């Protein structure tokens, strides 16, 4: 069932209320960003959980159940581009019937279910957010795919599965939530059988990002706060971390740098090339949503603080669109690596 504007955050799994939860997230984000090393992981987990409790309804309302971007070719629909991006991941990993793969950071299961349907493999989704997993299980049952979908409620660094459990693992714009790439890749390495592969689309600040440019720094800061990201690393950090934990790196490249005619990944956020399907996620659509939520809050149709959540997400969306246009940020740094054996 589609999320309706008037139902946003009505089922927030927190007794403090939306407004208090937003403030707790913002304070927690600053604390986690500035915390000492020994407190860092605990603070990160709290921030991630708060963030996804708040934004999941908005993601589904404005984007759908597959929480990621994709480049498009001219004439390709937004929905088709997302599915193609997911199918490519399954193809690269050679997923098929009889295989078991881990989806690290499965969200509400949109991509997981598409990959399970496409490949016939059984997919185990890993997610620390109970609110999202409740939906993922329901969507799997509704789609008739519960036999190919399993879900684990645990954090990325401590996955509740034995060593060498999986034939493959992937992550679609999800390991960006974990700034310590060595730790997250070490855990994925542990989970894979010898010879198995891992693939991901990672958030990265590209080589065009200038840490001395105040415009670049402001865009990165807005992207982090609005996206619940304590850090966004450079591609070299990704590559080095993969090798440090023992992976053989098979391929890395920025899929945003497509050759030939293409529609940029950030187009749905920027709003050029208007279509009804992408209106909610566009800049104009987000403004309409803001104005509607302002009225709905005043009428007490949606909880107090709902507009503030939307504005936090808009901060991220605007920053992503501009950072994408400038070429200083990509959400699709593709990595493909193998565990030796």
Predicted regions and their residues:
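A short glycine-rich, Lys/Arg-flanked "PGG" loop and its adjoining helix->strand segment in the class I
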Residues: 182-197
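N-terminal auxiliary segments of SAM/dcSAM-dependent transferases
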Residues: 2-58
């Amino acid at each position: 069932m589609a999320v309706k504007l008037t139902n946003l955050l009505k089922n927030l799994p927190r007794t403090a209320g939306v407004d208090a939860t937003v403030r707790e997230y913002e304070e927690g984000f600053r604390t986690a960003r500035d915390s000492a090393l020994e407190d860092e992981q605990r603070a990160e987990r709290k921030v991630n959980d708060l963030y996804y409790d708040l934004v999941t309804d908005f993601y589904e309302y404005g984007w759908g159940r597959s929480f990621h971007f994709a480049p498009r070719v001219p004439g390709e629909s937004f929905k088709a581009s997302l599915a193609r991006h997911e199918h490519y991941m399954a193809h690269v990993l050679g997923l098929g019937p009889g295989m078991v793969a881990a989806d690290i950071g499965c969200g509400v299961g949109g991509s997981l279910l598409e990959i399970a349907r496409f490949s016939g493999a059984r997919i185990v989704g890993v997610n620390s957010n109970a609110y999202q997993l409740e939906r993922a299980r329901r969507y799997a049952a509704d789609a008739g795919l519960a036999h190919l979908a399993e879900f684990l409620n645990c954090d990325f660094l401590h996955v509740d599965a034995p060593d060498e459990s999986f034939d493959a693992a992937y992550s679609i714009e999800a390991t960006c939530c974990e700034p310590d790439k060595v730790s997250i890749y070490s855990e994925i390495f542990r989970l894979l059988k010898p010879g198995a592969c891992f693939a991901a689309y990672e958030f990265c600040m590209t080589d065009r990002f200038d840490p001395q440019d105040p415009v670049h720094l402001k865009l990165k800061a807005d992207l982090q706060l609005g996206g619940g990201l304590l850090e966004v690393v450079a591609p070299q950090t990704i590559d080095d971390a993969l090798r440090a934990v023992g992976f053989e790196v098979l391929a890395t490249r920025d899929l945003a740098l497509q050759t030939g005619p293409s529609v940029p990944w950030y187009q749905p956020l920027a709003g050029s090339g208007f279509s009804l399907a992408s209106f909610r996620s566009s800049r104009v659509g987000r403004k309409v949503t803001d104005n509607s939520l302002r009225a709905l809050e005043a009428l007490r149709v949606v909880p107090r603080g709902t507009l503030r959540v939307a504005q936090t997400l808009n901060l991220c969306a605007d920053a992503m669109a501009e950072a994408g246009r400038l070429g200083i940020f990509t959400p699709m740094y593709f990595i493909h690596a193998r565990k030796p054996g």
